[in-house]
Amino acid sequence: MSWQTYVDDHLMCETDGQHLTAAAIIGHDGSVWAQSANFPQFKPAEIAAIMKDFDEPGSLAPTGLHLGGTKYMVIQGEPGAVIRGKKGPGGITVKKTTQALIIGIYDEPMTPGQCNMVVERLGDYLVDQGL
């Protein structure tokens, strides 16, 4: 299965009638493995800051999580495993796997819990596969 299939079929799929606004699978080095058509153009420094927060939990809290020029307020996640961010009625979930970052961006009417479930379910599966 291609990485694009994971994005299309597992991240951008419909959940309770809702779906993510955008999603991607990105290597720890910032290389894009696969992404939805409308995933924001991000800067390498934004991915580096996300990776730093996984190594040093809490480092993003003072500045916020930035992706594609959008700033998200960092909310409670799972140190070293999941970073969650909020911006207005939407937000972002980033799950770290052995080799990649699974990123889901949502907006209302999708809920934070639905986004977390979609992103973390795929992330947990990939971790189990050694990826």
UniProtKB/Swiss-Prot annotation:
UniProt-annotated location(s): Cytoplasm, Cytoskeleton
Could you tell me the keywords of this UniProt record?
A: Actin-binding, Allergen, Cytoplasm, Cytoskeleton
Has UniProt tagged this entry with the keyword Cytoplasm?
A: yes
Q: Which GO cellular component term is one of those annotated?
A: cytoskeleton
SMART domains recorded = PROF
Q: Which Gene3D superfamilies match?
A: Dynein light chain 2a, cytoplasmic
Pfam families found in the cross-reference section:
Profilin (PF00235)
Query: Could you give the subunit structure recorded for this chain?
Result: Occurs in many kinds of cells as a complex with monomeric actin in a 1:1 ratio.
Query: Protein name, please?
Result: Profilin
Q: Which organism is it from?
A: Litchi chinensis
